[in-house]
């Protein structure tokens, strides 16, 4: 059989094939067996029929290839024969009579290294007249392109090495797959090397478009094009992606806004050796959480890390001893998904890969490995890894040039059509079945592939909304997460804070007794108490685990904090209180901003101790905010954008040694007295007693009352021989003046040991019960509680 040159002719008017090369047909060799066949039938413009079959070849020579059989049934009117001419070639292959003489046929064989491509050809009769399709077009068939499978979504590799692509799009009337031979922005241009238009009759099942390619060798990335608009769109399910590039190209003629795009990589992340890694699976009540931003945690040169490790997952791993020294056993990472670098991590583009910039090489495959390394290091040190996730909105814009992925693929399915009143962001239709599946698949991916231990869902109120913005009593997404066999083994936390409007209001959340919540009321009430603006009953409620919010779940489901990344840092909370900060309930302790007044500085230090003390002696999960242990400041700004990287030089100062030492003491205290502070259930009412300064009833309804004492009787475990533990007596004084507090009577032979007095100098304002210098105070005696001071006593037998 004669050799037939046949240049690749991609659909969609792509100007070139792979590298501008040519596909060469060769005679079929004997002994070749045809593998799976794809058959096509065309009607011709002279009312005839042309049948084409494309098969893979498996030869005993191991070469493999593709066979294309062209057959024209019936010979009437074709007595002079027919010639097949490929587009772009002057040569032709004659069609010979098939067995039985009832049809004319030709068989071509193609080099497999050129697949995938499209074979485009015409037929000519003996007179030279061209025969085309009934639409007056060339006959065109894909080679190395199969129907594919609708599952799984995204790119996947089948057992025979074929690459399957699948994307959900209910409303697209046309879908194309773009393959690129060079990375976007890498000098090779943004136009695809090959475009494959998907046939809705072959490549569509329900609302899923799919196609299979025998090989993608020579290509580096891919994208989808939907609805006939020539704009590459990122596969929502891509696991390895390129960088988000801001650059206009042929797709963006006439646009005024910066154009953003990102292509999915055809690379496969190497399998990861997890070794003996196991989820710590710590009980909720035993958690001590540290919220951190991956980049800002070690980005500053003061971290002492190499440039390629600073601000990365590797940098986080390098500081694991810092977490251990604080007594932290869970880190809560701000969103690590690819995000808008101006708006910040709470405006994601994608949900299946970590941010490329969080790796030393700035590449997706490197980021994947670095994150897994970090998780393994944390687990080895008994520390869980929790992720903040944003599934309520994305950074995709309304304009076409800001359409990056789901908005262009199927806007009406993935997004709420008109958004939500007062919100300009692209709001995801979370409870739509398709978006719900995307979110569930993403969460499972992070658990199964990255060994993540749990998730904190930012902007949780939006997760309970329907397509019209209405509130749902049983949101399908939340219910599915709650009872999912994989996700039900993780920690799931709802956070009401919204990065869209910076609101942070507690709301009735459908929890199924499984969801924990970030307790906004805790922060508000503690701040107001220390500022002398709250009823002491509000403080008492928070100390006991916020029974008004978690009565059906227990105190362990309350994630407590006194500061967070979206507001004032802890040191700013006691240094700034101008009119713009009224919602923060902060107090500057007598002077705004930086001060050299020793009295002001002393009060600020005392207030920092008080905040930390109340955080750790309250029932619930304490959450530390990055930098609060070292006086990290944003100069009084509440804007997320004004936060800077952590300054590690400060770790050597006396102030930081004092604060970090106090935190370590408090975490150890919580662990030692887990019978009181690490409880799944609330304290028994009969074991809690409240007093004023002279052991009388507190002034619950007196707005001027700023002093409260709490006596907690230790529960005795009759099953344990050494279960006798001492009572606790805690005094909280937010007054400007000192108060003389009477201590409750004790059994004969017992004394009160003062473990904490936040007014004393360092070292000495905190001590363990085994410290021989700890102050002993007999029962029914009085203790002088200074202004703005918290004091903790523990009873112990004087003979012990």
Swiss-Prot record:
UniProt KW keywords: Carbohydrate metabolism, Chloroplast, Glycosidase, Hydrolase, Plastid, Starch biosynthesis, Transit peptide
CDD domains: AmyAc_plant_IsoA (cd11346), E_set_GDE_Isoamylase_N (cd02856)
EC class of the enzyme, as a word: hydrolase
Keyword Repressor: no
Region (Disordered): 1-22
Gene Ontology MF: a single term: isoamylase activity
Stored SMART domains: Aamy
The protein's name: Isoamylase 2, chloroplastic
Transit peptide: 1-34
Role of this protein: Starch-debranching enzyme involved in amylopectin biosynthesis in endosperm. Functions by removing excess branches or improper branches that interfere with the formation of double helices of the cluster chains of amylopectin and crystallization of starch. Works together with ISA1 as heterooligomer. The heterooligomer ISA1 and ISA2 possesses higher affinity than the ISA1 homooligomer for various branched polyglucans in vitro, but no marked differences exist in chain preferences for debranching of amylopectin and phytoglycogen between these forms.
Family: Belongs to the glycosyl hydrolase 13 family.
Lineage top rank: taxon: Eukaryota
């Amino acid at each position: 059989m004669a050799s037939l040159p046949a240049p690749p002719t991609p659909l969609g008017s792509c100007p070139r094939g792979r590298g501008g090369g040519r596909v060469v047909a060769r005679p079929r060799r004997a002994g070749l067996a045809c593998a799976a066949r794809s058959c096509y039938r065309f009607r011709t413009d002279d009312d005839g029929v042309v049948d084409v079959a494309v098969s893979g070849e498996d030869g005993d020579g191991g070469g493999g290839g593709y066979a294309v059989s062209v057959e024209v049934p019936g010979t009437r009117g074709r007595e002079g024969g027919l010639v097949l001419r490929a587009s772009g070639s002057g040569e032709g292959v004659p069609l010979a009579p098939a067995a039985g003489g009832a049809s004319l046929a030709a068989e071509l064989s193609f080099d497999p290294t050129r697949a995938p491509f499209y074979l485009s050809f015409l037929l000519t009769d003996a007179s030279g007249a061209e025969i085309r399709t009934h639409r007056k077009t060339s006959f065109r068939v894909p080679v190395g392109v199969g129907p594919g499978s609708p599952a799984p979504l995204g790119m996947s590799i089948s057992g025979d090495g074929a690459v399957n692509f699948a994307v959900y799009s209910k409303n697209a009337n046309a879908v194309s797959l773009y393959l690129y031979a060079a990375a976007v922005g890498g000098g090779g241009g943004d136009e695809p090397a090959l475009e494959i238009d998907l046939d809705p009759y072959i490549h569509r099942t329900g609302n899923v478009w799919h196609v299979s390619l025998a090989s993608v060798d020579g290509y580096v990335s891919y994208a989808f094009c939907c609805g006939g608009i020539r704009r590459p769109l990122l596969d929502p399910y891509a696991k390895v992606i390129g960088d988000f590039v801001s650059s206009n190209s042929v797709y963006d003629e006439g646009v005024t806004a910066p154009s953003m795009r990102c292509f999915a990589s055809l690379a496969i992340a190497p399998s990861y050796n997890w070794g003996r890694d196991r989820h710590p699976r710590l009980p909720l009540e035993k958690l001590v959480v540290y919220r951190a931003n991956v980049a800002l945690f070690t980005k500053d040169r003061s971290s002492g890390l190499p440039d390629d490790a600073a601000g990365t997952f590797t940098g986080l791993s390098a500081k694991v001893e810092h977490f251990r020294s604080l007594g932290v056993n869970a880190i809560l990472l701000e969103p690590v998904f690819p995000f808008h670098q101006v708006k910040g991590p709470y405006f994601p583009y994608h949900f299946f890969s970590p941010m490329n910039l969080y790796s030393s090489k700035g590449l997706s495959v490197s980021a994947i490995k670095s994150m897994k390394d970090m998780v393994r290091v944390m687990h080895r040190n008994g520390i869980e890894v929790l992720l903040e996730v944003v599934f309520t909105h994305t950074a995709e814009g309304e304009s076409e040039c800001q359409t990056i992925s789901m908005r262009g693929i199927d806007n009406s399915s993935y997004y709420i059509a008109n958004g939500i009143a007062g919100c300009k962001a692209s709001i995801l239709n979370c409870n739509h079945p398709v978006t719900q599946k995307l979110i569930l698949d993403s969460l499972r991916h992070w658990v199964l592939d990255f060994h993540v231990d749990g998730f904190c869902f930012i902007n949780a109120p939006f997760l309970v909304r329907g397509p019209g913005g209405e509130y749902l009593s049983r949101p399908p997404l939340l219910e599915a997460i709650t009872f999912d066999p994989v996700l039900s083994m993780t920690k799931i936390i709802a956070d009401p804070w919204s990065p869209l409007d910076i609101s942070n209001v507690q709301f009735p959340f459908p929890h199924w007794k499984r969801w924990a919540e970030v307790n906004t009321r805790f922060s508000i009430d503690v701040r107001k108490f220390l500022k002398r603006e709250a009823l002491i009953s509000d403080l008492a409620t928070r100390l006991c685990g916020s029974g008004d919010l978690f009565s059906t779940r227990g105190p362990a489901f309350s994630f407590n904090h006194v500061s967070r990344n979206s507001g004032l840092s802890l040191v700013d909370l006691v240094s700034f209180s101008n009119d713009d900060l009224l919602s923060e309930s902060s107090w500057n302790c007598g002077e705004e901003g930086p001060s050299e007044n020793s009295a002001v500085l002393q009060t600020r230090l005392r207030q920092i101790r008080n905040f930390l003390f109340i955080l750790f002696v309250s029932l619930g999960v304490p959450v530390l905010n990055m930098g609060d242990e070292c006086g990290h400041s944003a100069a009084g700004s509440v804007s997320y954008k004004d936060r800077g990287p952590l300054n590690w030089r400060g770790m050597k100062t006396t102030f930081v040694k004092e604060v970090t030492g106090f935190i370590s003491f408090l975490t150890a205290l919580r662990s030692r007295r887990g019978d009181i502070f690490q409880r799944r259930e609330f304290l028994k009412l009969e074991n809690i007693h409240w007093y004023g300064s002279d052991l009388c009833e507190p002034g619950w309804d007196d707005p001027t009352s700023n002093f409260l004492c709490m006596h907690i009787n230790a529960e005795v475990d009759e099953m344990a021989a050494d279960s006798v533990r001492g009572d606790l007596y805690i005094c909280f004084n937010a007054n400007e003046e000192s108060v003389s507090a009477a201590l409750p009577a004790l059994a004969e032979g017992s004394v009160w040991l003062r473990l904490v007095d936040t007014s004393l100098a360092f070292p000495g304002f905190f001590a363990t019960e085994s410290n021989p210098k700890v102050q002993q105070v007999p029962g029914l005696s009085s203790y002088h509680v200074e202004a703005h001071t918290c004091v903790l006593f523990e009873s112990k037998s004087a003979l012990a």
